[in-house]
Regions:
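Glycine-rich phosphate-binding loop of ATP-dependent small-molecule kinases
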Residues: 1-165
Length: 165
């Protein structure tokens, strides 16, 4: 959905996961640590996540806006990033559907073992559900049925975001 939205609104799309996976390839202490953390299915701690994402977003290509996927994942991150958010799109998907979709992707990602996927889903409930509630209270949340087909999801997101422009 991020790529579709990027094309529609002509702003860049990036994901926190992609940023972390790229950094995890680096032959540095941080790269090795990130690789271990990601492969275990654990969340990168708030302080490191904020440092990495906020530094990354200082690049000139993001000055006019961006679509950011997978961040913030905790209330601490949301509070620290509050000024950088116009709307939050939440694709509402059951655990069963999430597991099915992730497990069904053709991927060579080392962080997509069944154990790591289940741990990520558990982490989502523990840490990210409060973020969804945080943005709901601020009136910034757009909740979309993520179990529809791709076109239906895009239509619903677009309908809400078009109200902003």
């Amino acid at each position: 959905q991020g790529n579709f939205l990027s094309e529609r609104y002509n702003i860049p799309y990036l994901s926190s996961g992609h940023i972390f996976r790229e950094m995890a390839k680096e032959k540095t202490q941080m790269g090795r640590w990130l690789k271990e953390t990601i492969n275990s299915g654990a969340l990168v701690p708030d302080d490191k996540t904020l440092e990495i994402i906020l530094t990354y977003l200082e690049k000139p290509e993001y000055e006019q806006g961006y679509i950011l996927d997978g961040f913030p994942r905790t209330v601490v991150q949301a509070e620290a990033f509050n000024g950088g958010v116009d709307k939050v799109v939440f694709l509402d998907v059951s655990d069963k559907e999430a597991l099915w979709r992730i497990a069904g992707r053709v991927s060579d990602r080392q962080d997509e073992t069944i154990h790591a996927i289940r741990k990520r889903i558990d982490s989502f409930h523990e840490f990210t559900t409060p973020v969804v509630e945080y943005y709901q209270q601020q009136g910034k949340l757009v909740r979309v049925d993520g179990e529809q087909d791709i076109d239906g999801v895009f239509h619903d997101i677009k309908e809400e975001l078009d109200k902003l422009v």
